Amino acid sequence: MDTPFDLPPSCESRPGPAIALYPGTFDPITNGHIDIIRRGLCLFDRILVTVAVNDQKTPLFSLAERCALINECFPDLDDRISVGATDGLIVQYARQHGARAIIRGLRAISDFDYEFQLALMNRRLERSVETVFLMTGFRWIYISSTGIKNAARLQGNISGLVPAHVERALVEKFAR
């Protein structure tokens, strides 16, 4: 019988690599996301970057485009980073792919409130998957995909906020 003090299954010894899921809409991926992914690799053997389909958002880039843009960010880390997508529950996707943790980046206290509630719900749904919060690096704390899209749409300078190939893709999207 589970008591509040029983160790969750994620604490038990697991064979194989320590895998974490890093979910998001990534519309588009930013240097802030990349910072979280690279720092996550210091904690986990593999990161599954998971593009989440969110019916409440209308993405600028298609699912395939977002996955391709992410893949292009990590040519040197093919063995440690993989990209997938889901329209289901993230915590179920994590369990199905052997992930022991979900990584979430926090920019501000307002992010924490939402993310904390989400982490508690995920724990209720699947105790074997933990949530790990990583603070966004100071360089990227103000960056959001929405802000970058708005700046790009108005021909603002977004260089240094996203990888060069993402900047080109945004310029191309808004040139149409």
Regions found by a protein language model. Name each.
Residues 1-176:
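Nucleotidyltransferase catalytic core that binds NTPs
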